[in-house]
């Protein structure tokens, strides 16, 4: 019989260090469990999250109290129905399969080759700083249609926005950094928006400014910020997670090197294994029951994608990285109307361009024997360092 939510005490620091033990405890307690440090009812079960994502009338994206709104403005991620449908449609031309293949994949190849050119003469590096962060940043600058923006700047903006969106502890310094990043992005948009209005092109900003229904500058700004948040960290962290998964499973790496079509499997498994976007929030619009838990109108629920993608009721041996795992739907790109618009672009960038080039250009790639990688986060999760060596 459904009951009121259980609760547990866990700190944000503990979640950031390793959320998976907590996710397992929550799953044992109920479908939605109150975690006071997050100010959310956390949902960790695969089927419970799918149920919520299929019912946006009850589990609404529209959420006036969302941290995302406070940090980035009222974006399409916090809208439902026709309003969401229109704003999503305004960015989709930049992500069409034909546009990705014709315009973006060749540019991704050029950027990757240039970064690897700079590494080939070396014998060790931290792939986060020297490759994954600049790769994701430079590709996103191209996709957005920004000009004169350094990759280090957009990487900082993205991290500041993500930190702000996950600032459930109310840290004032984090909030100030997010505000500064938001203001800098507004300036970057202002510098190019008239150019894109006059010259239609494949970029996201051009797509927005030539949409059938005119968008306000406020709408454009908010949606660009959402794209900078998720559109940078997802490819960056999925690059690093896939490389980490393969380097810690040498037999799987051998299989991939022998059959490059398996790079796509490795990418999908990495997104499941460590979901870069690990949690997002929904507002309960009316009294309801989710699984075994009674929820009240205006409750805030955190859909823990990182937990759902390791739900043992869905995936066998879920904590293992296994590229030979039977193909099953995961939630690494979300679900329902808010399924990630950039999914194909990310699959092409990472699975078809980045991974083959890394392992081809950096022979005998392996983890650094003296500097283990570090993984952090729960709202957004991935390696924050990935020291590697190659050659001899």
Language-model features: locations:
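Cytochrome P450
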Residues: 1-392
């Amino acid at each position: 019989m459904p009951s009121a939510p259980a609760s547990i005490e866990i700190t944000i620091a503990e979640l950031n260090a390793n959320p998976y033990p907590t996710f397992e405890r929550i799953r044992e307690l109920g479908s939605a469990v109150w975690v006071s440090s997050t100010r959310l009812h956390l949902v960790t079960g695969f089927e419970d999250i799918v149920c919520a994502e299929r019912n946006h009338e009850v589990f609404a994206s529209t959420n006036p109290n969302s941290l995302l709104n406070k940090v980035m403005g009222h974006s399409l991620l916090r809208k439902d129905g026709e309003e969401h449908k229109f704003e999503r449609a305004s960015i989709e031309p930049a992500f069409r399969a034909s546009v990705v293949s014709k315009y973006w994949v060749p540019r991704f190849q050029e950027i990757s080759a240039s970064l690897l050119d700079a590494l080939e003469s070396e014998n060790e590096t931290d792939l986060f700083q020297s490759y994954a962060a600049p790769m994701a940043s430079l590709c996103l600058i191209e996709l957005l249609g920004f000009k004169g923006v350094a990759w280090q700047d957009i990487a900082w903006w993205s991290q500041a926005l993500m930190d702000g969106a996950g600032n459930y502890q109310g840290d004032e310094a984090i909030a100030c950094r997010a505000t500064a990043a938001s203001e800098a992005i507004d300036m970057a948009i202002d510098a190019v928006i008239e150019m894109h209005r006059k010259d239609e092109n494949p970029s996201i900003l051009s797509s927005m400014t030539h949409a059938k229904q005119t968008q306000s500058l406020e709408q454009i700004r908010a949606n660009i910020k959402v794209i900078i948040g998720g559109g940078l960290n997802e490819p960056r962290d999925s690059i690093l997670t896939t490389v980490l998964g393969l380097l810690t499973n040498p037999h799987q790496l051998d299989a991939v090197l022998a059959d490059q079509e398996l790079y796509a499997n490795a990418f999908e498994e990495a997104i499941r294994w460590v979901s870069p976007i690990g949690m997002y929030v929904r507002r309960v619009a009316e009294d309801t029951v989710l699984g075994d838990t009674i929820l009240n109108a205006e409750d805030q629920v955190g859909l823990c994608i990182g937990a759902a993608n390791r739900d043992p009721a869905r995936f066998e041996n879920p904590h293992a990285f296994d590229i030979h795992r039977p193909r099953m739907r995961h939630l690494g790109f979300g679900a329902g109307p808010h399924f990630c618009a950039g999914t194909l672009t990310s699959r092409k960038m990472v699975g078809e361009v980045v991974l083959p080039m890394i392992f081809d250009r950096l022979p005998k790639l392996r983890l650094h024997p003296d500097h283990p990688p570090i993984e952090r986060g729960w709202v957004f999760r991935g390696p924050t360092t990935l020291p590697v060596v190659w050659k001899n």
